[in-house]
Amino acid sequence: MLYKGDTLYLDWLEDGIAELVFDAPGSVNKLDTATVASLGQALDVLEKQTDLKGLLLRSNKAAFIVGADITEFLSLFLVPEEQLSQWLHFANSVFNRLEDLPVPTLSAINGYALGGGCECVLATDYRLVTPDLRIGLPETKLGIMPGFGGSVRMPRMLGADSALEIIAAGKDIGAEQALKIGLVDGVVKPEKLLDGAIAVLRQAIDGSLDWKAKRQPKLEPLKLSKIEAAMSFTIAKGMVAQTAGKHYPAPMIAVKTIEAAARFGREEALNLENKSFVPLAHTNEARALVGIFLNDQFVKGKAKKLTKDVETPKQAAVLGAGIMGGGIAYQSAWKGVPVIMKDINDKSLTLGMTEAAKLLNKQLERGRIDGLKLAGVISTIHPTLNYAGFDRVDVVVEAVVENPKVKKAVLAETEDNVRPDTVLASNTSTIPISELASALKRPENFCGMHFFNPVHRMPLVEIIRGEKSSDETIAKVVAWASKMGKTPIVVNDCPGFFVNRVLFPYFAGFSQLLRDGADFRKVDKVMEKQFGWPMGPAYLLDVVGIDTAHHAQAVMAAGFPQRMQKDYRDAIDALFDASRYGQKNGLGFWRYKEDSKGKPKKEEDAAVDSLLAEVSQPKRDFSDEEIIARMMIPMVNEVVRCLEEGIIASPAEADMALVYGLGFPPFHGGAFRWLDTLGSAKYLDMAQQYQHLGPLYEVPEGLRNKARHNEPYYPPVEPARPVGDLKTA
């Protein structure tokens, strides 16, 4: 053994070839600060070996390196800019030393080589991979850019266009594409990876392969003519401006950095990468996006822990076909859990099967599946008008009309046709689960399972624990949701549960703004362009359905009369009474016409102004800041109340439910992250300016207490140790 660290070791393999093996404690390798330092120490040893002929990098895990240790990011990002810059210089000196070894180097990559893992293997001369490879640089999705030389080496290896596509989008790619664009040199079966790697190294050692020529372009300026450079970077900047927009600065900065560094050799190019990375790491966007990643890991880890002793359902059923039922059936079947889809109406069953078939055909068109796979999946969805086969069902989700009487009757009838251990769930969006459970003989086997539309796209499923829901029931439904590829978040029961309970105060803030003379078009524009929602409130109401919102508004008002009961006729009432139901019938706040692809496209409709004039004061202008405050304060207050009342268990779960269920702008990180970034004291000052607008604007007592001491909701993060300590960690 030449060197042994906590996460890697160095040893002779054979005849002058050394192997550097990543083998961290636990299930995966991460390129954390300690591993970077350890890699430097291994190179200290390696550089002294006079009989060294070649170096092989490999992993003892199922994946090569999954990336940097993102749990370190928030504390690293608090290190002063100069110190963070110094540490990056140190880290890059390690990768440069790896790249500058006077012998050929090869990475034998199995599974993932992402982020720092990808940057590490770019520093070697050759990359041999297994077919399950995923390689890429996802840093821009975290609000930063590559910092270990990825923005320097990748463009010089692949050319600007291919590298920009991966780096700006934060993409990872598979083995076939990586080989095609020249990111890897060969693909071999896992059992042949080591022998294949040694064979390539031997060819490089004996001169059959020119490893020095392979290395040289990475040390030089990017080979691009002025015209090529102008075209590549102009197109890339245009694409990034269109897709990322102003709220996500990292992709544009990455493109501009690669452009600026193109005319320099490695050292100066790395300095430019460093100068761009460090300010990005100190942005609120980076903290928010890293926070989302960590929250996602926390939520998924919680679901995994909850289901560790539970068998995943093998047979499911959906009650109620149509778009929602068809969407749930498709998702279950697509992920490998056969499903019976029951309805009392033949037409609905046809609609449900058509929805599932449509989604599968889209996968076929995109080349993700073949006809055989399509037929296999669709054959596991069984439409039926009766309860045949329900004795084999492990879990049933009800997705019938949003009416408590109908839901209770359907659930009670189903309970009589399933096994005593079968779990029942309701896809209700607002009706309290404990109320629906009153119709059942086995309420302990019942809970809520709230999917979001469209089911195949929306990652969140709210799992609602009723008063009598058992732990086993919750665990089974969480297991099914996880198997479906969804992110399940368990919440306690109340009208609207978590997501709709916090959404309707936001809509109420919108209604009050319109009542006071705001133009809904400006409100939509401000909430989309300035705050960053994917849709403004008027557009969102049209998509949800004005009739659906009108009904849900009444349910929420009955559940929370003190805050959500209104004493005036609002814009939603006016549109509902005029049968303007939104996208579903082409008229809402906006008018909708189908585009060439058959998708609804919104247009202005002057007719809506006269309807809204009946429920509004004369038009007046509101500043962007006032619109954002009046829209967001009711929502944030309600989110805080849900945490205080135990409806949601943690700020992390609340923020993920908002991002995954409502499209809360990820660069804000969720309501609690936004609140922490703003500061609770500053938020209280802002909210108090609007408390005259009513109970929705009254700040909860717990938040007032936080504001007195300006305390955050997330645990405070300590800055990483000084850079000198980081080097030798």
From Swiss-Prot:
Pfam families: 3HCDH, 3HCDH_N, ECH_1
Region (3-hydroxyacyl-CoA dehydrogenase): 311-729
GO biological process, one term: fatty acid beta-oxidation
Keywords: Fatty acid metabolism, Isomerase, Lipid degradation, Lipid metabolism, Lyase, Multifunctional enzyme, NAD, Oxidoreductase
Binding site for NAD(+): M324, D343, V400, V401, E402, K407, S429, N453
The reaction(s) this protein catalyses: a (3S)-3-hydroxyacyl-CoA + NAD(+) = a 3-oxoacyl-CoA + NADH + H(+); a (3S)-3-hydroxyacyl-CoA = a (2E)-enoyl-CoA + H2O; a 4-saturated-(3S)-3-hydroxyacyl-CoA = a (3E)-enoyl-CoA + H2O; (3S)-3-hydroxybutanoyl-CoA = (3R)-3-hydroxybutanoyl-CoA
CDD domains assigned to the protein according to its UniProt record, in alphabetical order: crotonase-like
Residues under site feature: Important for catalytic activity: E119, E139
PROSITE patterns hit by this protein: 3HCDH, ENOYL_COA_HYDRATASE
Region (Disordered) location: 708-729
InterPro entries noted in UniProt: 3-OHacyl-CoA_DH_CS (IPR006180), 3-OHacyl-CoA_DH_NAD-bd (IPR006176), 3HC_DH_C (IPR006108), 6-PGluconate_DH-like_C_sf (IPR008927), ClpP/crotonase-like_dom_sf (IPR029045), Enoyl-CoA_hyd/isom_CS (IPR018376), Enoyl-CoA_hydra/iso (IPR001753), FA_oxidation_alpha_subunit (IPR050136)
Region (Enoyl-CoA hydratase/isomerase): 1-189
GO MF annotations in UniProt: 3-hydroxybutyryl-CoA epimerase activity; delta(3)-delta(2)-enoyl-CoA isomerase activity; enoyl-CoA hydratase activity; long-chain-3-hydroxyacyl-CoA dehydrogenase activity; NAD+ binding
Any one annotated GO CC term: fatty acid beta-oxidation multienzyme complex
UniProt-listed HAMAP family: FadB (MF_01621)
Family annotation (PANTHER family): TRIFUNCTIONAL ENZYME SUBUNIT ALPHA, TRIFUNCTIONAL ENZYME SUBUNIT ALPHA, MITOCHONDRIAL
Designated name of the protein: Fatty acid oxidation complex subunit alpha
Phylogenetic classification of the source organism: Bacteria, Pseudomonadati, Pseudomonadota, Gammaproteobacteria, Enterobacterales
